[in-house]
C-alpha cells in the first residue's frame, strides 16, 4: 500500500516517540517496488525515512510470492522472472531483501536495487546507529535497549553494505 502521509510526518514521529518513551523499540517496515512507486515516490520515502525516528528499519523490495493475488496478476501480465516453484525458492531466499524477480512498472530494476542499498546503508551508517542508540539510552535509561539497537543495526547494515547491485 502507499505510505499514508495525510496526517504528516510529525504525527508519525509523535506516535513513534510516544512508544519509545514507554520503552518500546520501533521497527519500521518498508516495502518498495510496487506498481505505484516511481522515482518521486522513492524520493519522498527517503525524506520520510530521514525524518522518522525508527530504531530499526527493514527496507526491502516487493516479492511476489506464489499463491498471492499479486503473483497471479504479475504472472498474467508476464512480468515474473521466477515461475518454477518450489525450485525457485532457493533464488528467492538468497535475495529476499534486494532481489527484483519481476519487472517493476515505473522503475528499472537496477535503480530500485541501488536505491534500497543506498538508503539502507545511509540509515545504518555507524554514526546514525550510535546516535539512535544514545537517544534510546537517554530516553529509557536502558543499556539493554540501546545495545539491542546497536547489535540489530550492525547486523542489518551488512545486508545493505554487502548487497551486490
Show which residues each predicted segment covers:
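Short linear elements at protein peripheries
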Residues: 147-165
Amino acid at each position: 500500500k502507499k505510505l499514508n502521509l495525510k496526517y504528516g510526518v510529525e504525527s508519525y514521529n509523535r506516535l513513534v516517540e510516544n512508544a519509545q518513551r514507554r520503552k518500546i523499540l520501533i521497527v519500521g517496515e518498508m516495502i518498495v517496488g510496487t506498481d505505484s512507486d516511481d522515482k518521486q515516490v522513492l524520493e519522498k520515502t527517503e525524506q520520510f525515512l530521514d525524518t522518522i525516528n525508527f530504531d530499526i528499519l527493514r527496507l526491502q523490495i516487493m516479492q511476489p510470492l506464489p499463491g498471492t493475488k499479486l503473483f497471479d496478476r504479475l504472472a498474467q501480465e508476464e512480468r515474473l522472472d521466477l515461475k518454477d516453484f518450489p525450485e525457485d525458492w532457493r533464488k528467492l531466499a538468497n535475495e529476499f531483501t534486494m532481489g527484483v524477480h519481476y519487472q517493476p512498472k515505473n522503475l528499472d530494476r537496477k535503480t530500485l536495487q541501488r536505491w534500497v542499498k543506498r538508503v539502507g546503508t545511509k540509515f545504518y551508517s555507524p554514526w546514525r546507529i550510535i546516535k539512535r542508540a544514545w537517544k534510546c539510552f537517554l530516553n529509557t535509561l536502558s543499556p539493554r535497549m540501546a545495545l539491542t539497537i546497536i547489535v540489530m543495526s550492525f547486523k542489518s547494515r551488512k545486508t545493505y553494505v554487502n548487497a551486490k547491485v
